[in-house]
Each structure stands twice: as C-alpha cells, then as structure tokens.
C-alpha cells in the first residue's frame, strides 16, 4: 500500500470512514420488536420493517388495537408451523381490516423461527393471522411455491424459541370442524410493542374476512 498514489489512499480512507458511519447509523436504527405473552411463556419477535414495510405496519396496527389479546394458537402442526392471530377461544374468527399486499418477494425465507403471514389460496388475502415456522419450509417461499406467490416472511423469533417448541409438541385434534387445534387452548394473552414502532399507523375500521388457511 505504501506505493499507492496519495489520491488513491485518500479514497480508500474516505471509503472506510463512510462505511463506519453507515454501520453506526444502522446500529441506531433498530427494527421494531413485539412481545407475545402466551400461556406457555413469552415470545419476543423482531420485525423486518425494511424488507416488508406493508406487512410490518399491518401487524403493528393489530398489536396497537389489541386485536391479538386473548386469541389462541388455533393451528399447530409439529415440524411445520404454529399459527395464530385470528381466532377466539371458542373458535370464532375475529373481524379484521382489509387484506394486504403479499410481500413474499422480499427475498426472506421461511426458515425455522421466522414469522410469516397466513392467508387463503388468494395471494393477497393476508389480514391478521400469522405463523411461526418450526423448520425451513422451503415450499412456502415465493421461489419454490406452487402458486408463484409464496408466503411473506416479516420477522423472526429472537427470544423464547423454547416456548415455540413447547407449543409445537401439544396434543391436537378436531375442534368445531377445525383440524390441528390444540386440545388444551394456548392463549396469546397480550401482544405489546417493545421499541421502534411508534410511527406505525392504526388500520381502518375492521371488516369480516374469510378464514385464513396457510
């Protein structure tokens, strides 16, 4: 490096300064985090606001309205997913806001412990229901999905993986016509924003929506 022209050294040093400043800015800009208090323990999730802005804003809106409080994890399939966010303890679906755009093309994968949106067979039908992947479910990624749309990943579990794994092992059966329902209800007692989400808007007036089914 001693033989490089001085002007080149200037650019290199300047580049390192710029990179260092950028990394510092990234450290300051933290992703939103949400705590899910369940009857099996607490689960903390980090939301990928940059990669899935519409989906994250939608999820935070439901959190702020208290939509998730008192809902159950109504679909549990070991080695696949834990799903919740839309059903009451008596297996009635809660009213939701309008469906959102499917952001599954954001490059994120349905890897173990990622947080994704459930939907019907219609690609842009996600509302409030979400699921946590219990393994890498590659067929749910846009690149490998049969419908060429896939299921949007918008966050990941950063604390409480053992709680998710515990939920995955509960006994399930058919309840009021629905399969894979925990026979002992697992309740999401409360969802609360921990940080980084103060600016998320509250969605419009809720309306009825079809049952979400991944």
Q: Residue ranges of each PLM-predicted region?
A:
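Bacterial N-terminal signal peptides
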Residues: 10-25
């Amino acid at each position: 490096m001693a033989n490089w022209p001085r002007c080149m050294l200037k650019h290199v040093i300047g580049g390192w300064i710029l990179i260092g400043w950028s990394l510092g800015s990234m450290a300051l800009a933290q992703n939103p985090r949400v705590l899910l208090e369940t009857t099996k323990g607490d689960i903390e999730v980090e939301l990928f606001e940059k990669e899935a802005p519409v989906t994250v804003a939608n999820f935070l809106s439901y959190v702020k309205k208290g939509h998730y409080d008192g809902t159950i994890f109504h679909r549990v399939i070991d080695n696949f997913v834990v799903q919740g966010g839309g059903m009451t303890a008596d297996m009635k679906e809660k009213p939701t806001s309008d469906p959102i755009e499917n952001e599954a093309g954001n490059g994120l994968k349905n890897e173990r412990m990622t947080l994704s949106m459930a939907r019907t067979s219609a690609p842009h039908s996600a509302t409030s229901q979400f699921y946590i992947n219990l393994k890498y479910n590659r067929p749910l990624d846009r690149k490998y999905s049969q419908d060429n749309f896939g299921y949007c990943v918008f966050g990941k579990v950063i604390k409480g993986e053992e709680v998710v794994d515990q939920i995955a092992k509960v006994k399930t059966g058919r309840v009021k016509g629905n399969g894979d329902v925990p026979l002992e209800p697992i309740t999401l007692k409360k969802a609360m924003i921990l940080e980084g989400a103060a600016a998320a808007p509250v969605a419009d007036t809720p309306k009825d929506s079809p049952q979400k089914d991944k």
